[in-house]
């Protein structure tokens, strides 16, 4: 992979190109320079709005990861994901990332709602050019089950958890489901 300096130099004659800005953003994010990465993701979203929808959508989601560990930036995180949903509402990834964030902050109604909305759009689509940590529809079902439990939907949650255990899911989801079921005394 090219260095940041090489990427910037090669993009210097075409800095409005969303592809160049996206590559630079990724390079900055990979070395932990999230403020710089965010700036280039924003440039990607602005310059690619009408021409590069997948890059724009991916950039808006990655912005949420850039601010994830920064205290006081919760609204920026939420807004970047809501903008991604507004921009491409028929894709599941931003719904998942937002639902998972709501789970982590114990906003159960919001978690449940965005998981449910995301489940409407889980058909196979063009792969994103960057990892946004969306493993598949089962992750939205997991978020729905966890938040449903806290919202008083015990039977629905147990049913979803048990159904997920019959599927090919990532080990961390399987162990989390097994742990949750052991805590509530169900299997």
Language-model segments: residues:
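Residue at a conserved register position within TPR or TPR-like alpha-solenoid repeats
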Residues: 28, 67-68, 102, 148, ...
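Amphipathic alpha-helical segments of tetratricopeptide repeats
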Residues: 43-46, 86, 116-127, 163-166
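Structural motif corresponding to the intra-repeat A-B loop/turn of tetratricopeptide repeats
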Residues: 31, 70-71, 105, 151
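"A position-specific structural signal for the A-helix of alpha-solenoid helical repeats
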Residues: 23, 62, 97-100, 104, ...
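Short coil turns that delineate tetratricopeptide repeat
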Residues: 15, 49, 89, 123, ...
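Start-of-helix register in tetratricopeptide repeats
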Residues: 19, 53-58, 93, 134, ...
